[in-house]
């Protein structure tokens, strides 16, 4: 008993989380306090997050494009061209706002952006990351929910209302904000030929978006919708708002290919089958006429002068997405297994196989979670009922669904046993 009490007296504890020296890997001693490695790591994460939210400013007090791009790099893998376009656009937006109060002969117009890229290439993630790091009001809207005024659905003014809410109803701040409209390709005109039926969720929405994207004084109901007819409307000027629109534009690559260089004939012709060029490579050749054929009206295309295309994610990029970001999928599943007291290990060959399966599905990064779920489903089903499992190893054969994962047991059971 005396030995136990003396041991407990000699045991050191973290002054922050209270864990003992036996529960952590490292305990660092100060003059009168101790801190464990887990608390140090947590403090570093907090410092990094605060550093990212305070971007380096240029001479005019405007975030530099390189600094914005660097922060985007921490969250989004690849897509350097799209990051470059977004960084410059946001930088110029800040500059316009910084100089808008000065009396200048030249009025700088805003350059709204259209992001075009295959599904799962990172369009929405880029916008979400911008929202995290910017110090101007930012809102995201879904174009699929919008309808023309007078029909069931959301009015375009609701987008301005969301921005107003993001600015805590400060109209001055909201007027200098950034709006991201996702799934913009879903409001394309349903047919090249005018129809006798009204297209309230397609061309009608494009027409309604024109004025707020160009710059107008919108009347916004503070409580939203039409349920409160007696409410007073807020007047919001959209002239200084930056609009970023994004969409997958499924089928646009076929329109571009059809317009393209045509079918070459003769010995010197450069003949390439459509399958040889990936969707992202074809989308790089997009022209306004292609967007017109897709179903966007000319006036709407004119409001989006900057078009940035995103690439298909290759094998190396998908492997980085699996492992590199702070919330990478491998880290997420490793944490789930850690809750069971088990270490989860993926071999390099296994990660490569997961990336190849995602490429074959043509779903980009979005398909990675479904593949990981299918690989780990049986293991996650069996593991809570197993005892003394130290580690689960996922190799190439497991990733190809040829064999079951390898279970590494503790001392009580043989390590070579597998399920």
Curated annotation (Swiss-Prot):
SUPFAM superfamilies: Glucocorticoid receptor-like (DNA-binding domain), P-loop containing nucleoside triphosphate hydrolases. SMART domains: AAA, ClpB_D2-small, zf-C4_ClpX. ATP binds at residues 118-125. It holds the Pfam family ClpB_D2-small. One of its GO terms (cellular component) is HslUV protease complex. One of its GO terms (molecular function) is unfolded protein binding. The keyword Nucleotide-binding applies. Residues 2-55 form the ClpX-type ZB domain. Component of the ClpX-ClpP complex. Forms a hexameric ring that, in the presence of ATP, binds to fourteen ClpP subunits assembled into a disk-like structure with a central cavity, resembling the structure of eukaryotic proteasomes. NCBIfam families: clpX (TIGR00382), PRK05342.1 (NF003745). Belongs to the ClpX chaperone family. This is ATP-dependent Clp protease ATP-binding subunit ClpX. It comes from Gluconacetobacter diazotrophicus (strain ATCC 49037 / DSM 5601 / CCUG 37298 / CIP 103539 / LMG 7603 / PAl5). The lineage of its organism: Bacteria, Pseudomonadati, Pseudomonadota, Alphaproteobacteria, Acetobacterales.
């Amino acid at each position: 008993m005396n030995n136990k009490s003396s041991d407990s007296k000699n045991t050191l504890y973290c002054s922050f989380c209270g864990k003992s020296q036996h529960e952590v890997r490292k305990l660092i001693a100060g003059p009168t306090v101790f801190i464990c490695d887990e608390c140090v790591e947590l403090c570093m994460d907090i410092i990094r997050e605060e550093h990212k939210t305070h971007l380096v400013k240029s001479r005019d007090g405007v975030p530099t494009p390189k600094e914005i791009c660097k922060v985007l790099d921490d969250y989004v893998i690849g897509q350097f061209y799209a990051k470059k376009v977004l960084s410059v656009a946001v930088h110029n937006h800040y500059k316009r706002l910084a100089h808008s109060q000065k009396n200048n002969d030249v009025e700088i117009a805003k350059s709204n952006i259209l992001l075009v890229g295959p599904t799962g290439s990172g369009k929405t993630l880029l916008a979400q990351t911008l929202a995290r790091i910017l110090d101007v009001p930012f809102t995201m809207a879904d174009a699929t929910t919008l309808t023309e005024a007078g029909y069931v659905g959301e009015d375009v003014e609701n987008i301005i209302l969301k921005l107003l809410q993001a600015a805590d109803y400060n109209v001055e701040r909201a007027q200098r904000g950034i709006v991201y409209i996702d799934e913009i390709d879903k409001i394309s005109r349903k047919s090249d030929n005018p129809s006798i039926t009204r297209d309230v969720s397609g061309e009608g929405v494009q027409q309604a978006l024109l004025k707020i994207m160009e710059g107008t004084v919108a009347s916004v109901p503070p409580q939203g919708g039409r349920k409160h007819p007696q409410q007073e409307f807020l007047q919001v000027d959209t002239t200084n708002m930056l609009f970023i629109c994004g969409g997958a534009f499924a089928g646009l690559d076929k329109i571009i290919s059809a317009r393209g260089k045509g079918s070459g004939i003769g010995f010197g012709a450069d003949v390439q089958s459509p399958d040889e060029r990936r969707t992202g490579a074809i989308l790089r050749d997009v022209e306004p006429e292609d967007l017109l054929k897709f179903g966007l009206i000319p006036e709407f295309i004119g409001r989006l002068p900057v078009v940035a295309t995103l690439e298909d994610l290759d094998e190396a990029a998908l492997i980085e997405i699996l492992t590199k970001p702070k919330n990478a999928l491998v880290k997420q599943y490793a944490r789930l297994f850690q809750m069971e007291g088990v270490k989860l290990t993926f071999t390099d060959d296994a990660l490569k196989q997961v990336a190849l399966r995602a490429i074959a599905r043509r779903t980009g990064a979005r398909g990675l979670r479904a593949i990981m779920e299918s690989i780990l489903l049986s293991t996650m089903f069996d593991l809570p009922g197993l005892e003394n499992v130290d580690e689960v190893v996922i190799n190439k054969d497991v990733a190809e669904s040829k064999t079951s994962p390898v279970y590494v047991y503790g001392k009580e059971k043989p390590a070579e046993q597998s399920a």
